[in-house]
Each structure stands twice: as C-alpha cells, then as structure tokens.
Amino acid sequence: MQQRSTVPQVPQYSVGKILLVWAAAAGPMAVLGWIVGPALAGPLGGLPMARLWGITVGLIWQFVLVLILLRREGGTLRWADVRERLWLRAPVNAAGRTDRRLWWWLAPLIIVSAVYALMISGVVEDLWVKLFPFFAEPASFSMNAFMASPESRAALAGNWGLFLLFLVQMFFNTVIGEELLFRGILLPRMAGAFGRWDWLANGILFGFYHWHQPWGMLGSAIDGSLLYALPSRLFKSAWFGIIVHSGQSVYFTFLLLGLMLGLAN
C-alpha cells in the first residue's frame, strides 16, 4: 500500500557536531566499561556483572542524550513530532511515498543478521584482534565465560532481578538508546556532511564507538553499516535498524530465560 508522504527536513550536522555527539556517547561508555566497572567489581558480583551495570547506565545516558538533542533543535517532544524527526515512521520508497510493502525487507535482513552473528562475526573478531592484539577481550571481562561456569548458572537460576537488568540493558541497547541515537538522531542529520555515503560513515562511527568492547569494533562497523544504517537510510525509517538490531535481544532473552528457569544446569 502506498500513500503520499512528505519526508520532513531535519537539520544537518557538521562533521564537528557529528563527532561531538559520537564522543558524548563513546566517551562515557569507555569510562564506564574500563574504569567504573572494574572499580565496582567487588560489590557488584564480579567484573562481567559490574561492566553490565556500567554499560546499562551508559546506554540510558544515550537515551537522555537523544532527548537533549531533540530539545535543543527547538521542536516538541510530542510523539507526532518526534516520530518524524527520528525517522520512527513507516518506510518510504524512492518516489517519496509511504510504502508498507517495504516492511517485507525485514525478513531477509533479520535472516542475514542472524547468519552474520552466528557464523561470521566470530571470524571477523578473530581477524580484528590478530591485526590489533591490544584490542583483544581480557579473559576477566568475558560474559560468555561467566555464564558458562556452573557456579554462575546456579546463581542465575531464579534470579529474576538480574533477568530484569538484562532486559533493561537490551532495550536501551537496541531500541531507545544506542540504536535510536545512531539511526534516529545521527543518520538523518549526516547527509549534509557525507552525502550519499552517510550510511557508511554512520556505520563506521558506530563500530568505532565501541571503545567499551574494542574487540568487536570491526564487526560492529560491518553490521552497523550494511544491516542497520543502509536499510534505515534507503527507507527513511529508523525502525529497520532498530528491529534488525533487536533480533539479537530476542535471541539472548530466550537464552537467559533458560538460565533463569534452570534449564541449562
């Protein structure tokens, strides 16, 4: 179904302002992940859990940053206004018309994203840390190793407060924090500086924002460019990046639910 649609004009950022917004997101995440998290490892149940708390705070800050930037643009925070300024709208075709059939592109994008995450991202990460070994994940940081230990699995069973923390972290990661900042705020405002390559610049910035987990920078730049930014740019809808990125949240939610129910012991 096609409808006439006027894609609203949003202010365009200079390269300097884009980098300032990027730094406002990347800087706190790096500090929380590498300094605050380790400092609180004892009282928060170990380094992986302390980093989880710290990164969650950083992602919540990114949502606050989105609101600050919207307010500074001078518009209202009413949904009817915000949804247009953040591209939280139905997809738009090349003729500038709302075309709900374009939602079907989500199916192959989600499949490709899953294949990339399960079969390719590990290879990309290995290549990246071979090229830059100082970016390798410290063993004490590994959430996978933490979750794999029998002691941790036993402690997680029935720990619904921790399950809620994971849900909050994932929601702010792939919906209203990280993803909304990069695909809702930055991407619509980068064409003035980067032209038709705005989606690529957005994905590269997304990858190199991950100073809190630099072992994943290259992989995040690849999926951030091709799977999140490019479809969001083509269809003028940040929902594409949000939904595709949230596939990993759904996957991890089911894994965690199994741990909470003690099914993995």
Question: Language model features by range: what are they?
Answer:
Residues 112-116, 145-265:
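Transmembrane helix-loop-helix hairpins at the membrane interface
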Residues 83-91, 136-144, 197:
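Juxtamembrane inter-helical linkers in multi-pass membrane proteins
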Residues 123-153:
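Membrane-interface interhelical loops and short interface/amphipathic helices
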Residues 1-114, 118, 126, 131, ...:
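N-terminal, membrane-interfacial amphipathic/helix-forming hydrophobic leader that caps
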Residues 2-9, 41-52, 140-151, 166-169, ...:
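Hydrophobic alpha-helical transmembrane segments
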Residues 34-38, 121-126, 179, 183-184, ...:
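Short helix-terminus and kink motifs of transmembrane alpha helices
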